[in-house]
UniProtKB/Swiss-Prot annotation:
It is a single-pass membrane protein. The keyword rRNA-binding does not apply. This is Potassium-transporting ATPase KdpC subunit. Signal peptide: none annotated. GO terms for molecular function: ATP binding; P-type potassium transmembrane transporter activity. The system is composed of three essential subunits: KdpA, KdpB and KdpC. The chain crosses the membrane at residues 7-27. Keywords: ATP-binding, Cell inner membrane, Cell membrane, Ion transport, Membrane, Nucleotide-binding, Potassium, Potassium transport, Transmembrane, Transmembrane helix, Transport. The keyword Membrane applies. Part of the high-affinity ATP-driven potassium transport (or Kdp) system, which catalyzes the hydrolysis of ATP coupled with the electrogenic transport of potassium into the cytoplasm. This subunit acts as a catalytic chaperone that increases the ATP-binding affinity of the ATP-hydrolyzing subunit KdpB by the formation of a transient KdpB/KdpC/ATP ternary complex. It comes from Burkholderia ambifaria (strain MC40-6). Belongs to the KdpC family. It is found in: Cell inner membrane. One of its GO terms (cellular component) is plasma membrane.
Length: 193
């Protein structure tokens, strides 16, 4: 029995050192050296101060800002500790009621409802933390944002186009607009205007 315990303890200690200390240390050094921005949370700074992350959505509800996907996290929106599959199923009657309420909120905010509403403006994301919307969802909001900021719709549309990221490597994913980056670009454009 003692002959079995010694190798087990040695293997346990070696694996603990390798997987608990060495591997995390090597990955941390590698991440900081090769991908420093991503390793530190992809933080977005304004005036030398972190204002958010490019990877986690934030609530914007003022008419002068583009609004992101809705967050279904609890107890508050965009709560990273509450992230996870929180959408209702497509056959759940509560989903239809929530979508109707969200469309009414868009109408109350002065959004033109004569055009079809992009689905990502009225449904929550699976994680509840999506930082991006589709170009269609951004284009849908251009008139409202331009009016609230006293800018031309063309100026705002150009900012949307400038902040639209294409597919990764030209084939992966869909074109998308990071809401935080777009709203910061809007603030900068208005300050320069």
């Amino acid at each position: 029995m003692k002959t079995l315990i010694r190798p087990l303890v040695v293997i346990f200690v070696v694996l603990t050192v390798v997987t608990g200390l060495a591997y995390p240390a090597v990955m941390t050094v590698f991440g900081q050296a090769v991908f420093p921005s991503q390793a530190n949370g992809s933080l977005i700074e304004k005036d030398g101060r972190a204002v958010g992350s490019a990877l986690i959505g934030q609530p914007f509800d003022a008419p002068k800002y583009f609004w992101g996907r809705l967050s279904a996290t609890s107890p508050m929106p965009y709560n990273a500790s509450g992230s996870g599959g929180s959408n209702l199923g497509p056959l759940n009657p509560s989903l239809a009621e929530q979508v109707k309420a969200r469309i009414a909120a868009l109408r109350d905010a002065g959004t033109d409802l004569s055009k079809p509403v992009p689905v990502d403006l009225v449904t929550a994301s699976a994680s509840g933390l999506d930082p991006e919307i589709t170009p269609a969802a951004a284009a849908y909001q251009v008139e409202r944002v331009a009016k609230a900021r006293n800018l031309t719709a063309d100026t705002v549309a150009q900012l949307v186009a400038a902040n639209t990221a294409g597919r990764q490597f030209g084939v992966l994913g869909e074109p998308r607009v990071n809401v935080l980056k777009l709203n910061l670009a809007l603030d900068a454009a208005q300050a320069a205007h």
